[in-house]
């Protein structure tokens, strides 16, 4: 009897997706179709898009009295590390929700912006206009490092909060996917043509490899007196240590997550536990090492138990800490 573990189907989809391309570009050009195939819909999450069934439209009927059936629309989520967004970008999102969406703009509990009710034919223009404001939807969803959160206020004349934001920005930059799929599929050149969509040219993906992470990975940065991001509910929480008015390091908490599947007794909520104390200049490398440990050892056979909290529960803190140190080369 084989001991080989059967992987979840999503793992094969990612592995054979040409670094998150799939056949998204060709399906995007298909006329008469308002949705993507199931495999591509899964890949689209990494691009910040969720394909959704418009349930209200199910009630509508054709001229002959027959029901129209399923009608699809999309949610578009913008990734904004630390939640800092310019007035220009915010106003652009308000404009987009009126022009292409259902008229609503949602500010998420994880410092992102969401447009709803976008139809397939308007996706590319929506993403292109978000990009013009120097923001992106790439990595806002999917099996990657999600939006890195940070307590934003006060915005000015506060060196500690400035350092927190710098840490959040640095982690977000370090852990962003390197694939060029997003640029090639969604962004256009000056003539309005999508770039290089016919030929797959792989790039080095040093952190995520071919299959990215087993599931999403969430990070938050905050202070003891202002835990506005609720960092103990994340895979990784960095709690700032302030001495003599300056930020000197972080207490590292890992393994948080409140998600539960009611029908699966094996799932459970968890509060993050302290793993270590690190210096400010060590925060990024420790974050990367933890993500790499999760990449290599997380559960890829069952997505219900594929978060870091389950790996921590299985291993225990000492083994987890020791493995992270190995990845750091210590």
Where are these regions (language model features)?
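Peripheral terminal and linker regions in Fe-S/redox and tRNA-modifying enzymes
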Residues: 1-330
């Amino acid at each position: 009897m084989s001991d080989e573990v059967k992987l979840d189907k999503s793992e094969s989809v990612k592995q054979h997706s040409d670094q998150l391309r799939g056949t998204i570009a060709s399906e995007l050009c298909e006329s008469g179709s308002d949705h993507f195939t199931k495999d591509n819909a899964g890949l689209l999450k990494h691009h910040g898009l969720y394909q959704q069934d418009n349930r209200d439209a199910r009630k509508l009927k054709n001229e002959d009295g027959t029901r129209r059936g399923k009608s699809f629309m999309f949610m578009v989520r913008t990734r904004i590390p630390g939640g800092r967004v310019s007035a220009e970008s915010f106003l652009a999102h308000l404009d987009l929700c009126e022009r292409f969406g259902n008229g609503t703009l949602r500010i998420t509990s994880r410092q992102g912006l969401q447009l709803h009710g976008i139809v397939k034919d308007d996706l590319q223009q929506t993403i292109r206009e978000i990009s013009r404001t120097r923001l992106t939807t790439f990595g806002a969803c999917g099996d990657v490092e999600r939006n890195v959160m940070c307590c934003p206020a006060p915005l000015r004349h506060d060196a500690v909060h400035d350092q927190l934001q710098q840490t959040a920005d640095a982690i977000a930059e370090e852990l962003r996917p390197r694939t060029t799929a997003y640029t090639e599929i969604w962004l256009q050149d000056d003539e309005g043509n999508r770039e290089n969509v016919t030929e797959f040219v792989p790039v080095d993906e040093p952190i995520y490899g071919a299959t990215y992470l087993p599931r999403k990975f969430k990070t938050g940065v905050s202070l003891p007196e202002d835990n506005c991001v609720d960092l103990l509910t994340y895979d990784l929480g960095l709690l700032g240590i302030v001495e003599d008015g300056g930020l000197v390091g972080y207490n590292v908490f890992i393994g948080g997550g409140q998600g539960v599947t009611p029908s699966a007794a094996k799932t459970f909520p968890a509060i993050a536990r302290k793993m270590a104390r690190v210096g400010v200049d060590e925060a990024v490398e420790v974050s990367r090492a933890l993500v790499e440990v999760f990449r290599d050892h997380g559960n890829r056979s069952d997505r219900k138990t594929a978060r870091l909290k389950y790996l921590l529960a299985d291993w225990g803190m000492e083994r987890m800490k020791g493995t992270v140190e190995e990845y750091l080369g210590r």
